[in-house]
């Protein structure tokens, strides 16, 4: 399970990232893919990268398999678990841009600068149920894609095929589908950041005991529906911040509030599900911030002239 988040600051700079909530770590680390790095495809012609990319992931046979990544132009994408709903094509379709589902991360960040361009191109994309190699299964994912102007959600399901949704609340979690989550927000329209006031109930004065009464009923558990509601509510109501430091703090404050704490969720395999890492990319400074469940120190990595022009992957 996972939570994705995006917002902009008072200058229009994007802050975008995610929690990765799983039952184990995968040996993931920060990866910078420079320009002119080999980029193989399953169904398209092999090529080389045109834009530098930074994000978290693992390297598989020289291929940077990202969990979330961001290009030098400020366009980013994160893949989140979408179990029971994700259904990719059984094979390539003539006349379509055929991508193995894992390839969408680098295809998006290599070919586009703006979400509007991605939305148009996706009309001709077919995502194929093809793993990176025989050691890996196909992950049932959906994706949040964002620049500083807007965000979209991309889902492929058996019932609806590929659907692209505008994401005005700047949040994504897991199943059910995104449209269900938007509908569910209607159950929480009574939430308000302002405290309730004293009332008279048939002559009996009834007054709140303390602060926070306006948000009474805000979910706090770890199911995807409730993480979506809480993250969306906090994202909408958190004041717009000024400066990089304040906005990075804002980002981590929101996502840590929906983090899965080790020991609080045990999956059907008997493993703890927990937030392995939290990460945020700042488009203004081209900086990737992250910390881990077992190491809360905030680490920073930058796309700069050295890393963007490296002759090989830069891994940390």
Curated annotation (Swiss-Prot):
Deoxycholate binds at residues 2, 18. Its EC number is 3.5.1.-, 3.5.1.74, 3.5.1.24. This is Conjugated bile acid hydrolase. It comes from Lactobacillus acidophilus. BSH is a promising microbiome target for developing novel alternatives to antibiotic growth promoters (AGP) to enhance the productivity and sustainability of food animals. The keyword Hydrolase applies. NCBIfam families: bile_salt_hydro. GO terms for molecular function: hydrolase activity. Belongs to the peptidase C59 family. Optimum temperature is 40 degrees Celsius. Maintains approximately 70% of its maximum activity even at 60 degrees Celsius, whereas its activity rapidly decreases below 37 degrees Celsius. Taurine binds at residue 81. Optimum pH is 6. Rapidly inactivated below pH 5 and above pH 7. The keyword Aminoacyl-tRNA synthetase does not apply. Bile salt hydrolase that catalyzes the deconjugation of glycine- and taurine-linked bile salts, which occurs naturally in the intestines of animals, releasing amino acid residues and deconjugated bile salts (bile acids). Can hydrolyze the amide bond in the bile salts taurocholate (TCA), taurodeoxycholate (TDCA), taurochenodeoxycholate (TCDCA), taurohyodeoxycholate (THDCA) and tauroursodeoxycholate (TUDCA). Oh et al. did not detect activity with the glycine-conjugated bile salts glycocholate (GCA), glycodeoxycholate (GDCA) and glycochenodeoxycholate (GCDCA).
